[in-house]
């Protein structure tokens, strides 16, 4: 699964949030990136098409309703998918051993 850098940044916002978010909230959260509203709309639709984001409901936004979204997969699940695409399956045990060793070092 490949996400563009911008899509990854959008997903980081969702992974860090503790609640479903509407497009307007995403826009306010990433004002420093100077993305256009239409670009964010396109990225949200792309992320849903890729299966990493899902629509979960609606909230009142002014006089209309806005869709709300949440991650369909966790950040860890996404990273596992990326690694699985890049690493041959026969190297998974070595990867897991390296990760466990890293956890042991970090916890000391």
PLM features: what roles do these ranges have?
Residues 3, 35, 105-106:
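Alpha-helical hairpin
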Residues 3-6, 58-80:
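Short, cationic-aromatic polyanion-contact patches
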Residues 34-49:
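Short amphipathic alpha-helical interaction segments
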Residues 20-29:
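Short acidic, hydrophobic short linear motifs in intrinsically disordered regions
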Residues 48-60:
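A short, conserved structural fragment
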């Amino acid at each position: 699964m490949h996400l563009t850098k911008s899509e990854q940044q959008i997903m980081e916002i969702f992974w860090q949030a503790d609640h479903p978010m509407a497009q307007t909230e995403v826009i306010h959260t990433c004002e420093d990136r100077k993305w256009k509203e239409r670009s964010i709309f396109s990225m949200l639709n792309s992320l849903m098409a890729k299966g990493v984001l899902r629509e979960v409901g609606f909230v009142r936004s002014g006089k209309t309703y806005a869709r709300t979204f949440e991650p369909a997969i966790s950040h860890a699940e996404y990273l596992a998918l990326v690694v699985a695409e890049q690493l041959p399956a026969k190297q998974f045990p070595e990867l897991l051993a390296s990760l466990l060793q890293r956890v042991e070092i970090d916890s000391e």
